[in-house]
């Protein structure tokens, strides 16, 4: 009841709800492809790699989106370059590049005049989101979802069978980096909602939950977006009522939903599997 009253009275709570739900939906869309491609670590890497861009943006007094997006894309390109030009495997390249970028970000933070806003970027504070940030998040979400819809078939084929995709004449490498660009945009849009530390959880957990419930990509995307939005709403509710960290509350709700699916999913759930073993 207090939450509903707050929504009616406070503009900051309305902006927080809209921003959180938007992030939950678009994270579910991109997260589904990240899960299918086995690129969860890449999502973690890009979410950490944007930190120096955020720090530089604050030091120069410009919108953090510009710096964060630039460094996120640079990290994706750097990981691909190291992987292709050496014997280093992809997971090792990811570890090297994202650690270097994150370390650079920490050093740059120490030079920043104020660490308050940067703290919010690290851990999220959606209750302090501004109107400009809310609209930026909405625009990014619309752009990303529209591009995914346009390139849906290409992403579908290249995610399940890259060799077949190349046989069909698709540029698999271009699709990979294009998806990394979309991942970077989603990561940047989620910074003030759940923060750099927890953004990977909102990308992966709702999508992983949906993966347990269906084998169809379109249905998986719909379920992941729904779980992301529900996690955002419930997490924001507990954050507002009990004065909890908003990002952490959303991630915990998403994790609880995942474990419910992990136990009770009709075909993939742990209890269903045990029951099937007993019957056999």
Swiss-Prot record:
Matching InterPro entries: ABC_BtuC-like (IPR037294), ABC_TroCD (IPR001626)
Gene3D superfamilies: ABC transporter involved in vitamin B12 uptake, BtuC
Keywords, comma-separated and alphabetical: Cell membrane, Ion transport, Membrane, Transmembrane, Transmembrane helix, Transport
Superkingdom: Bacteria
Keyword Transcription regulation included in the entry's annotation: no
Protein's UniProt keywords contain Transcription: no
Subcellular location: Cell membrane
GO BP term, example: monoatomic ion transport
Transmembrane spans: 16-36, 41-61, 62-82, 92-112, 137-157, 168-188, 193-213, 221-241, 244-264
Pfam families referenced in this protein's UniProt entry, alphabetically: ABC-3
Membrane topology: Multi-pass membrane protein
GO cellular component: ATP-binding cassette (ABC) transporter complex
Assigned protein family: Belongs to the ABC-3 integral membrane protein family.
PANTHER family, per the entry: ABC-TRANSPORTER METAL-BINDING PROTEIN (PTHR30477), IRON TRANSPORT SYSTEM MEMBRANE PROTEIN HI_0360-RELATED (PTHR30477:SF13)
Function statement: This protein is probably a component of a manganese permease, a binding protein-dependent, ATP-driven transport system.
Name of the featured protein: Manganese transport system membrane protein MntC
Organism for this UniProt entry: Listeria innocua serovar 6a (strain ATCC BAA-680 / CLIP 11262)
Lineage, uppermost ranks: Bacteria, Bacillati, Bacillota, Bacilli, Bacillales
